[in-house]
Every structure is written in C-alpha cells, then in structure tokens.
Amino acid sequence: MMDARMRGYNATVNENHSYGRAIRYDPTLHTPIGFLTDAIQKANEARIAAFSRNGIGLVIMGNNGYYYYQLPQGMLDVILDVNKKEGRIIDINITEYGKRWSVISRVNNKLIWNALASDDIYNKLNALNSQGKDIVSLAMNEYSDYVIVCDDGTTECSPKFESTVRQAKNKFGKILSACVTALGNCVLCCDRGVYFNYIPSSAADILKKVDYIPRYVKVTSYGRYFISDGNTRSYYWF
C-alpha cells in the first residue's frame, strides 16, 4: 500500500505502460474503508477487489477466497456459489453507488456472467453470448455507461467510450478488464499497458511506478484504487 493522502494534480500520464489523463485527488473527500485494508493485510494477498463510494466492498484471494462487507445479496449469492463449486472468479465490479454489480466466473471450465444491470446491458450480454462470445469483464455505472470485454478481445461499450476503447487497443493491444466510474470515466487494462480517459492522481502515481503491467485497475471518482497483477501483488488505497 502506498500513502496517497497528500497527493493531487492534473496532468497527462504517458509512462511505464500507462496512458491517459490524471485528475486531482482531493484527500478531504476520502472516507477510509478500513475493512478492506484489514482484510488484505491479514491475508497478505489480493487478486481482485471491487468497492463502492459508500463502503460496500469485496476482495478476492486465490481462485475464490473472499472477504466482503455489505455486499448486495444477489452478488454475495453468486460469490458463495462459485466458492462452493470450486470455480474461479475472473472479474468483479460494483458501481460507485452500490446499485449495480457484476461477477464473471469460470466454473467447470465455462465462463459465466452474473450481473444486476440495465436492460440495455443485459441485451448486449445476451447478444454476445448468442454469437459464441464469452464475457470476461463487465464494468458500468448507474447511468448506463458500460464496457463489456470478451475473451477473444471483442468489446462492446456505450458511445461515450468508443474512442477510448479504440485508442486503448491501438496503443496497448487486447483489452483484458475494465472499470467505469460514476463520473463516466473508464480504465482499460490491456496486454501491454493501462489506458484511461481520466483517473484520480492517487492511482496515477502508482501506475507510474508499479513494476508490472496491471491486470486489474479499480478506481472511484474520488481517489480510491486497487491495482494488481491478477495474482498476489497489489497496491490499494481504500
């Protein structure tokens, strides 16, 4: 974990396999989620995390180990079921206000998505499945901004992200996972780097220094972040 409390700036980031615009992190808007920090420190590892602005949180360790706080019941039921079936959690996302969520898992070698989302997003997911596409990441907010990532590199997104998604692929290759904030910003983890339209400067500081290409980057509009290699190494500020 790196202390981001005193940091804040606006700048373009173009270094260490990361590209995009950093916006000033304001520490006066930060309310800690101590549970998530305690859980990661106790386990000494974290593979994926998802969290809201109001304190809802979930951390995944290993294939399907988990710690959670105030998860929506539907999301918790999915996590418990994957754990019971000894599956693997592929990606998780919770919207900043905690009203929408997604869980992508692999159970018995089959990729499965579960989500609480808008009808438009459900229609996109079902259409991709009908084309034989497997979903590996679904990120969204309460305003129906979204990015869907398939295992073959196919993406679907709301119109506002089309340019960002195209530029991310051109610069860093296949998109692996996504994050969308309440303000309609997105972060895209790719084969060769991380591309974003806007990211809090607290997270940008880590991306400029981390010694691996992140597999997951989760952020909120107000500066919380989780950045990991998809295995055991992570940086976080909750």
Predicted regions and their residues:
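Short beta-strand motif characteristic of blades in beta-propeller domains
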Residues: D3, R7-R24, A50-N64, D91-N109, ...
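Trp- and S/T/G-rich repeat-edge/linker motifs of beta-rich repeat architectures
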Residues: M1-M6, A22-E45, G65-R88, K110-D134, ...
